Amino acid sequence: MLGAFLAVVVLATAGYLGYVAARRSQPVTLPTPTGPYQVGRTIFEWTDTARTDPLAPQPDTARSLSVWLWYPGAPEPGETTAPYLPGAWSGLHIGGPAGLGESGFGVVHPHAVPDAPVADGRFPIVVLEPGSGFAAPQYTALAEDLASHGYLVAGVTPTYSANLTVLHDRTVTASKAGLPSAFDNSDLHGPAAEQAAARLLSVWVADARFAAARLAALDASGRFAGHVNASAIAFLGHSFGGAAALEACRAEAACVGAADLDGTQYGEVVRAGLTKPMLLVASENSCVTGDCTGSADASGRAAARRLVAASTGPVWCYEIGGARHIDFSDYDAYYLAAPLRKLLALGTNGRGVTLTVVSAYLDAFLDQITRGTPQPLLTGESRPYREVRIQHTPGSETSPPR
């Protein structure tokens, strides 16, 4: 009997592994951009010679960054789209046996054309910062959609804070200073986490402002000459990148608004608030908008409430039901085997759904603050997404705890 049982287990396991192998090899196309423009993509490596990198293991190292730029493009018909994560960037794939349950990056297809000509027009700047440990290319779906709506989207990978970045064709991994263990603590606003966040935030904010300045300078000559609207700069981020986006907007005079995607807030902006428009988008029962229940992060809820109360600019807050923290990245679009989905704590909305919803709200927010176009989606006059709960809009009272 035992032998027969073991044989059944072995056959079932082999069958499941075969199923996973087949699924991970099937093509995955990222969500189709919804704007009127085609999308181009190019990759820069920029060094801020004015800053010594405090996160680098070697002393006296200038701060260098990989910046992926997605932009409104005008490629020739039939041009081949860019590979999703070329060369050494493929190292972002989950390693070890667990990676066998993730779509191979060679079958993930974005929509941008590499180094395409720039479309006619002048376009606002959006600086995108990833979550801690993540790299900007892992937000390709959001970036491509924004670019298709007429934005220059500069994705900044924070060197030594990302698990992997690529500079000069060589991989650079995280350092202890760049990816502090204090963030592994359940209390993200405890003394150790606050100290680590303060140190890291200053670096990430400087990264975002440096990238915005370098992108603005591209308006003077070269491919992007005459295409950069440097008078309209917005900052966007996920997780810790969201905290950095808000603080960068507070510090940057040219900022016209900032969006935080499911990121616990830190820094002076929590105490002083933001005078510019602000968008906060939360996963289900996340505390980043100040509205959460149960055993959720009480200190994070308090920080978000202080931020909203102190802000004099317009504030929009939304919760996406069925979404979890990692769904704001391209992981929402990959095939992931069920055990891996559980390990990564992804949501229940189905592949690509959360990304589609987030893109729609980002598009609406940015169109309103950079172009003055009224957005029924933001006010709730238009409610196409059943997953979304409106928590706060300009002129409304902050939502009470549920």
Residue ranges: model-predicted function:
Residues 77, 107-166, 288-290:
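Short substrate-entry loop that stabilizes the transition state in hydrolases
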Residues 1-11:
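N-terminal Sec-pathway targeting helices
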Residues 160, 165-227:
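Alpha/beta-hydrolase active-site loop
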Residues 52-56, 195-201, 343-356:
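Active-site rim elements
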Residues 211-273:
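Primarily recognizes the serine-hydrolase "nucleophile elbow" in alpha/beta-hydrolase
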Residues 20-126, 347-351:
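Domain-level recognition of soluble alpha/beta enzyme cores
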Residues 24-26, 74-76, 320-326, 331-402:
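Alpha/beta-hydrolase-fold serine-hydrolase catalytic core, especially in secreted/extracellular enzymes
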Residues 256-325:
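The feature captures the conserved acid-bearing segment of alpha/beta-hydrolase catalytic domains
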